[in-house]
Amino acid sequence: MKLSNLSPKAGSKKRRRRVGRGIAAGQGASCGFGMRGQKSRSGTGTKAGFEGGQMPLYRRVPKLKHFTIVNPKNFTIVNVGQLTDLPANTEVTLESLMAAGIVTTNDGPLKVLGDGELSVALKVTAAAFSNGAKAKIEAAGGSCEA
């Protein structure tokens, strides 16, 4: 085998299509672009997603209703008023609330909201607090840990 004997495999090389070189060449006259219209003209065509001036789908979609959030943040929610039955200086976590029966299902990390009143000092450990809940827990002498 010598370099002078090497040749590409049969069928691996394809000739470039030469358009606009007469009718006999197969792609003469309009070069395969049809008669008229925007797609037959020279230069760039339309951008991706262009729908002829109509509001394109990618701009219509957010305006429509009933689209679900792809990755929603789900929390197990407890209001401050539900914590009044607990004894003073108790450490409140999602597990302790489930054991006490205040929360029945684990829907995700614990979030404490500020509805209701609290008169007992508690050590609350949760993933998130509303501003009102944090103020009420600390006003009752408790602490909040995220």
Swiss-Prot record:
The lineage of its organism: Bacteria, Bacillati, Cyanobacteriota, Cyanophyceae, Oscillatoriophycideae. The keyword Ribosomal protein applies. This is Large ribosomal subunit protein uL15. Residues 23-35 have a biased composition (Gly residues). Residues 1-52 are annotated as: Disordered. Belongs to the universal ribosomal protein uL15 family. Part of the 50S ribosomal subunit. It comes from Picosynechococcus sp. (strain ATCC 27264 / PCC 7002 / PR-6) (Agmenellum quadruplicatum). PANTHER family: 50S RIBOSOMAL PROTEIN L15, LARGE RIBOSOMAL SUBUNIT PROTEIN UL15M.
